[in-house]
Amino acid sequence: VRAGILFAAPLLYRAGKARMAPPGGDVIGRRRVDAHFAGLTALGTEIAIDREMAFTASKGLQGANVFLPEASVTATEQTMLAAAVARGETVIRNAACEPHVNDLAELLAKMGADIIGIGTNVLTINGASQLTGATHKVVSDHTEAGSLIALAAATGGEVTVQDVDPEHYEMTKLVYRNLGIELEFGDRSITLPATQSRQMQPDPRGGIPVIDTGIWPQFPSDLMSVTIVLATQLTGTVLFFEKLYESRMYFVDRLIAMGANAVICDPHRVVVSGPARLQSIQLSSPDIRAGIALLGAALCARGTSVIRNIRLIDRGYENIEAKLRQLGAAIERHKMVTDE
């Protein structure tokens, strides 16, 4: 699991050292860890890499000025965790500011760390000699909620997702409006009405409209796959440009096998024209986001589809079949040897 690398900072604080295997995670492209190393090294950590990664902070963690080489979510969280217990002040520049990063910062602040700049790409953290316990409600998963909305829109359904912060979905609302899908925001909810135009808006300059991903608050890469499936069921043509990961688009060949009208231009770009009548298929989930997208495609398809390797979907979507059944999906989980 990729998030396992986040044990490094807490172990450095408690034991002065840590040793672990390189992180895993979805194979969606080159996912570097140098940003983690940049943050920890600046705060006084020595790092040695062989078959494992060895971290040592023999003199303890010391505050410093840190410029992350990329606005990585986990690298920002790693550096925040270390800075929260480091001596002195740490300034993190080019920090990620996704909702779950801000949520961790809020928790650390409750536990005693002094953090300024939450929600921005510059964080100033004055570490605490010791963190205390705190009560905290974890922020809702904007990717899970966004995926459910996309799947409901793809199947022509209606859904209200509750206990979410609509501010986290401003870019999604804008992108989906250009696809002919309107979302309605409540105080703590998002509603997808049943009546939609489902007609993609033309590009003002006469070209093919483009949906591209970027670092927060731009359109999130984690919603790209389900949005591609949505586009196969809408009227019009759109170019998807995945700027962050070079292997995110590889699942589209499965959609083409199901009958989608799509062209893979290169590892980063796909053109989709809709609507297409998808056919059922048997396939294996390649990663979390492609898996939930292919599950959505199966819901749109005629006939019964079988999706294997669902443990990857489970990593990002807990009890997904129960939630989809509540929305009217005909879906069942079966125990198979390949999923043991």
PLM regions and their residue ranges:
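Short, structured segments at the rim of ligand-binding sites
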Residues: 1-340
